Amino acid sequence: MALSLVAVLSVIAYTGHLPDGQIMFKWLSAGIAFCTTVIITRILSVCTFTGADAGGNAYSIRTIAIPFLMAGLIVVIHSLIQMTGVASAHYPDGFRVLAGFDNPAGVASALAVSFPFVIALADRLKERWIRYAVMGAAVCGVIMILAVSRSRAGILAVGVVILLWVIHTIKDAKTRRIAAAILAVLVTAVVVYMSFHKRGSNSGRALILGVCWDMFKDAPLTGHGLHGFRSWYMLYQAEYLDRCASRVLPMLADNITHPLNEYALVAVNFGMSGLIILMIGVVITIRHYLWNQSEESFVGMTVLAGIGVLSMFSYPFRYPLTVLGVLCALLLVYRDTIMNLSVRTRALSSAVTVMMSVAGLVLIIPWARAQTIWGRLSYMSDSGGYNKEVLEGYHKLYPKFSKDPYFLYNYAYVLSENGEHQEAERFATESFNLMSNYDTALFLADNAKECGILDIAEEYYKLASRMCPVRFVPLYGLFCLYENMGRKDEMREIGEKILTKPVKVHSMDVRHILSQVQMKLLINQ
C-alpha cells in the first residue's frame, strides 16, 4: 500500500501552485510520501514484532509489481483519453500524448519502467489463455501509446524487455546463450539504426554528443562537476558551431539542458571516474544475477535493462518513477543477499533507513513550502504584479534558492520589469554562471541595453546568436543596437544577414522582424 502511494503520486501529482508543477511536484509528493511511509511501516513493524523478521513478502514480485501496475494503468488510461481528444495535452509541439508529464519522454519512462512488472504479474497467472491475453493486451497497449507519443527509444526499451522474456522461457542453456548473443547483436544494430535513420533528430543528437565530447576532453578524469553540463554546455555549443562547416547543424542548434543521453551526462559531469563507478556497479549487479538466478532477480534485471536502453536516447531519471523503479529492481536482484543478512544487521539497516527518512522530511517539507511561495510570486508577476510585495517575497526566498538558476532568472526578470536594471543584472549574471543558456544571455543583452552599457549588450547579443544561430531575435537586437549607436555599416551587414537567413519556423515574430529590417534598411539607404 505504501509503495503504491509513492508510485501513483510519481505519475499523477500536479499543481498549478509551483513554478514547475508537473515535475517538481511529482518529486516533492513522491519524496514526502516515501519518507513518511518508510517511517510509519518501520514503526508499525516494531510495534507488531515483525521488525527485521518480516520475511520475504516485502521483497516479493507481487508486492513490488502491483504499485507499478497501478502507475502504468494510470498513464495508459490518461494517454488513451488524450488520444481520443477528450482531454488535450496542451503541448506547443503538438504531441497528442503527455499523460500528466511535461514531455513524451515522461510517458516513455513511466511505461518502460512499469512494463516489466506488468509482464511479471501476468506470467504468474494460472490460466494459460488468460496469461497470454493479458500479456498481449499489455504489449499492444504500451506499443500503441509509445508510437503515438513518437518515442522510438521507448519502443526499443519495451522490445528489449519482451525479447529477454522470450529468451527466459527457453529451457536449453546452450540455445538460451545463442539467443542472448543474437539479442545483443540485434539491439546494437537497432541502436545504430536509430542513431542515423531520422536525419533531423539524429543530426541534432550528433551535435549534442559532439559538444559533449569537447566538454569531456577538457575534463576527462573528474568531469565538470554535479551541474557541469547545464553550467557550460551552451558556451561549448557556441564554440563548436563557430568552427563547424556544416550548414545543417546550426539550423538544429537549440537551448539544451540535457544531452538526451544519461551516460553522456555522467561522462560530462563526472568524467572517467563516474563512468568507471557506473560500470563497476553494472558488472557487480550482472555478476550477482548470474550467480543467484531466480524469478525475482530476473524481473529486476529486465527493469534495469529497459531503463538502461532508454537512457541511451532520453532522460528517464528526470522522473521519480524511474528512480523508484531502479531501487525496487535492485531490491529484487539482491533479494537473496538481503534475506540472508542477520537479524541484527537488518534491524540496524532499518534504523538507518528511518533516520534518513526523517532527515529527508526535514529537508523536503521546508523546500516544498518555499517552492509554493515561489509559485505564488511567479503567478503574481505573470499577472502583471511587479509590486513591492513580489520583490520582498523574492528577496526573502533568495537565501534558499541562491543556487537555483531558474529562480535567479525569475528574480532578475521581476527586478527588470520594476525598473531596477542594475540589480537585475546582478541576479541574471548569477543565473548565467550556474546555467549558461540562450534565454539568460538574451536577457542580459536587453538589460545591459536598458542600462546604457552598450558594449556589454553587444557581446551578449552576439553570444546568444552564436549559441542558437537559427534564432532571429539576437540578430535583430544587435541590428537595433547598431542603429541606435549610429553604426550604419554594421547595421546594414546584420540586416542583410537577417534577410538572407533561412527560416526554420515561420512565425508572426519572424515575419515582424523581417518586415522591420526591410523597412529600416530602406530608410537608411
Model-derived features: positions:
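Alpha-helical membrane-protein architecture signal
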Residues: 209, 222, 256-264, 302-305
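Long, contiguous interaction/recruitment modules in multidomain scaffold/adaptor proteins
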Residues: 278-373
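Transmembrane signal-anchor hairpin modules in multi-pass inner-membrane enzymes, especially those
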Residues: 1-70, 121-134, 166, 174-180, ...
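Alpha-helical transmembrane segments of multi-pass inner-membrane proteins
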Residues: 7-14, 24-42, 56-93, 99-172, ...
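A membrane-periplasm/extracellular boundary helix in multi-pass inner-membrane enzymes
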Residues: 86, 146-149, 154, 165-218, ...
